[in-house]
Amino acid sequence: PWSHENPYLYQLEITLTDSEGEVTEVVPYKIGFRDFILDPTDRVMKLNGERLVICGVNRHEWNAASGRCISLEDMKWDIECFKRNHINAVRTCHYPDRMEWYTLCDEAGIYMMAETNLESHGSWQKMGAVEPSWNVPGSLPEWKEAVVDRARTNFECYKNHPSILFWSLGNESYAEDDIAAMQQFFKEKDDLRLVHYEGVFHNKAYEDVISDMESRMYAYPQEIIDYLENDPKKPYLLCEYMHDMGNSLGGMNSYMELLDRFEMY
């Protein structure tokens, strides 16, 4: 089965015929087979029957010279950088990426969190405090179909990529009925992947209907320990941490060593 260690892909040939049986189009496509579940017996994420250990990064589409216009060579360089640094997973922060990136991750065995392009943290944070009175999309009916359509577009474009293990509902957009509707869409369409969303941490009233995992940003190691040692309902995933600029990134081992202590991390 497909995995980071063995990203084997099969060559599928899709043939389209007309009503007379004549071939009108032939499309080659690479596919992979793998089994990914959240085991209900121990609440551990498992790929092909084994615990999934994620050593991942967030990746923006960015080139220092060309800005957000990146090339195929830029993407291949990133894959090589991942391999050199033992990185096995990537989050497409905070929007879908170029289609070639998903194929490269299929071929390289990079586990992907495919994020939907939704971010609105300016609408529910005031001077750094959580204050959702202006929250968008929130539970506003006029926004519901718009955000569900973004989830639908993300799903329909990339649903056949074995590298995608997680659908992400977006980034820093709080959590109310509209984001719950996005979760419901993915659950109805795809039972082979998990759904991720960090923003529900700020509105626990929705924790049972949004996100298959407890997701956090920039939590201290002790906060992670406190969660995992107190009968956690969900596995724990840090979707952002160690945001490093300049001469930084010290103390990373305090996070990594928790992988050996907690199977739900």
Q: Where do the protein language model's features map onto the residues?
A:
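Secreted/periplasmic carbohydrate-active enzymes, especially glycoside hydrolases
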Residues: 1-112, 149-151, 165-166, 182-188, ...
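Substrate-binding/catalytic cleft of secreted carbohydrate-active enzymes
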Residues: 80-82, 89-265
